Amino acid sequence: MTQILVKNAFSWVNIAEDVCKFIPNCKLTVIDKEAIPSVEDTNVIYIGDLMNVKTISMLERIKAKNVVLWVDETRVPKTSYSLKNLKYNYWIVPVSQWNKEVYEEHIGHTEEIIPRCTEFRRTEGKRRGNVLFGVVSFTPGVYKRYEELLLAVDYYRKNYGELEIYAYGHTEGLPSFPGVHNMGRLGKSEIQKLYSIADFAIELGIEAFGMPSIEAWAMQVPMLYGNVNDVRNHAYGVSIDPVDFDAIDFGEYILPVPIYDEYKLAEKIREVAEIEEVPELPEKYRCSYTAKKLISYLEA
């Protein structure tokens, strides 16, 4: 049996569920931050972040023969950690080039990059109605863009035509605005339904390490995305520079945010919405492919 351990984070649990479907005799265990899971299986795949004392302590205490660590970091770690006490064979598999560089700086050798994955697939033709529909995934990093986005939506309506926005994710506390629908936190199937009616998607996060760009591409929806970190490598659509990335002080997590001009942002929305054809998602972003790659380490 292969046991998958996954941190209790919404996007990673969704991914782990899809990966487990393609691994024979697979058992999925969702773990809390403080938990030391019971592991009796020979092979373990751990999914989540790694640069954390509690996480590494947990990994050191489980009993297994072979462990694959499919991991990411959303911030540069402040402290170096070591996995030297692990008593089993392990492979560190980063999800992106940025993650690979971070782990190799702090831990050492890593394996080839295996990006995040999805099994979303478009089953309906792209909609083209009189009203343009956009989907926005909200994370804390996007809050800084909310007012600018609303101004751009208002500008678009006055100059180009009707536009409706559906926002999901961390939308708690966001002010109401005509034609902007805050959907809150949605399940996997509900997110897929949103993308099935969307003409375009927006991801303007400063950190931008999440799943929306891959999910939108899988649903063949073009995206307006922030040109930062690794999102530029797995998004299809139109990019916009959201921040002077060299000016970010990660030590204090200071994120200087220049102001978007509503005209510029509205023009970018218009540009991405005019993309009619989006190619199918490359195989390397499919969880069926990911499962084969991860299990290959355990079978070597």
Swiss-Prot record:
Transmembrane segments: none annotated. This is Putative glycosyltransferase ORF300. The keyword Membrane does not apply. Belongs to the glycosyltransferase group 1 family. Glycosyltransferase 4 subfamily. It is an enzyme of class 2 (transferase). Its EC number is 2.4.-.-. GO terms for molecular function: glycosyltransferase activity. Keywords: Glycosyltransferase, Transferase.
